[in-house]
């Protein structure tokens, strides 16, 4: 899993004062999507989506809401208050989406190279990616966070993951 577009000059995320939990997910300034390769079997697709989300949550401030306590006081960890759509695309479209998103300084991009699902030791994953030219890397998923209108232009009309 790699963070491929973490611009130094443009911070992607929400300031604490922007986190308004009364807003609809469609009213949030930023949109978060994870696009998964439609050719993956269900278990690998779910794995790819989760692995793309992990570095996104760690790198983009303000995506998670506050913890929620139920009526008995049991605390449930915060979830993405802005929502996160998990979409599917064929591998060529996934690559094109990744390329478009990376070209935008106002978007955050994290990807899951296919090597992440074919290695069991993280140093092997690093070696596999490190010896592969960028154009030869296949992707299982890409996570994108950015201004709503920009993300919509990047992803087009992709369907939700079934």
Residue ranges and their predicted role:
Residues 2-162:
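Positively charged, small/polar-rich N-terminal and surface patches that mediate targeting and assembly
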């Amino acid at each position: 899993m790699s963070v491929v577009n973490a611009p130094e000059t443009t911070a992607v995320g929400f300031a604490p004062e922007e986190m308004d939990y009364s807003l609809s997910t469609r009213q949030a300034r930023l949109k978060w999507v994870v696009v998964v390769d439609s050719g993956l079997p269900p278990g690998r697709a779910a794995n790819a989506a989760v692995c793309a989300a992990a570095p996104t949550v760690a790198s983009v401030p303000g995506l998670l809401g506050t913890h929620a306590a139920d009526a008995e006081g049991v605390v449930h960890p915060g979830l993405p208050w802005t929502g996160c759509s998990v979409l599917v695309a064929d591998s060529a479209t996934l690559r094109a989406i990744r390329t478009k998103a990376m070209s935008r300084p106002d978007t955050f991009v994290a990807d899951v190279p296919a090597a992440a699902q074919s290695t069991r030791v993280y140093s092997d994953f690093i070696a596999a990616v490190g010896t592969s030219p960028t154009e030869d890397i296949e992707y299982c998923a890409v996570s994108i966070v950015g201004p709503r209108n920009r993300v919509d232009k990047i992803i087009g009309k992709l369907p939700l993951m079934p």
